[in-house]
Amino acid sequence: MSNLSARTGRDHQRYDNNFRLVSGCIPYRLVKDEEEDSTSVDFENKLQVLMISSPNRHDLVFPKGGWEDDETVLEAASREAMEEAGVKGILREDPLGVWEFRSKSSSVEADCCLGGGCKGYMFALEVKEELAIWPEQDDRERRWLNVKEALELCRYEWMQSALEEFLRVMAEEGSTKEDSLAISSISNRGERQIDPRYCFVV
């Protein structure tokens, strides 16, 4: 049993026009072979995301929870990642997006707010540390999955949408890195220099 504790209660919960504000993240890691070029990414298998089971259920979700009035939306996402999934890392400041949703469970729906609606901010979290002990470890299981598996097993449609946006962002970033590597290789082939007007910092 964990000696750490998770926040409970709704005394500090933030709301926006009767929508309960929620913050969460998609924890991820890149699995690379030792001899593999660190800039290449096989998005089917090398990019993995961490999902967790819901309490008393076997379906899978990403860590998320109420955004409270004594923290920023980024702090809330980091806290939920630690409390629910037992991970810490580098949280990207730009959100993947904001999703409005209603829970299919009437009990959770009532907990969301008077109208049953929530507004969820989702971020990408590059995992740097997996804790052996974390607040909700007795109620949740962790599973690393590739993106295809995660899309198939994800419980909520809005989380699937967030995952698709996450994949788009990562694929875009991977393409940018490959372009930067190509420019670097060309510039080192001989004495010819690339016109600095066509070089970009990424």
Curated annotation (Swiss-Prot):
Its cofactor is Mg(2+). One of its GO terms (cellular component) is mitochondrion. Signal peptide: none annotated. Coiled coil: none annotated. InterPro entries: DDP-like_NUDIX, NUDIX_hydrolase-like_dom_sf, NUDIX_hydrolase_CS, NUDIX_hydrolase_dom. Residues 18-167 form the Nudix hydrolase domain. Keywords: Hydrolase, Magnesium, Metal-binding, Mitochondrion, Transit peptide. The keyword Acyltransferase does not apply. Mg(2+) binds at E80, E84. It comes from the Eukaryota. Inhibited by fluoride. Optimum temperature is 37 degrees Celsius. It is an enzyme of class 3 (hydrolase). Expressed in roots, leaves, stems and inflorescences. A motif (Nudix box) lies at residues 65-86. Disruption phenotype: No visible phenotype under normal growth conditions. It is found in: Mitochondrion. One of its GO terms (molecular function) is metal ion binding. Optimum pH is 8.5. Its EC number is 3.6.1.-. Belongs to the Nudix hydrolase family. Mediates the hydrolysis of some nucleoside diphosphate derivatives. Can use diadenosine 5',5'''-P(1)P(6) hexaphosphate (Ap(6)A), diadenosine 5',5'''-P(1)P(5) pentaphosphate (Ap(5)A) and adenosine tetraphosphate (p(4)A) as substrates, but not diadenosine 5',5'''-P(1)P(4) tetraphosphate (Ap(4)A), diadenosine 5',5'''-P(1)P(3) triphosphate (Ap(3)A), deoxyribonucleoside triphosphates, ribonucleoside triphosphates, diphosphoinositol pentakisphosphate (PP-InsP(5)) and 5-phospho-alpha-D-ribosyl diphosphate (PRPP). Monomer. This is Nudix hydrolase 13, mitochondrial. The lineage of its organism: Eukaryota, Viridiplantae, Streptophyta, Embryophyta, Tracheophyta. The gene is NUDT13.
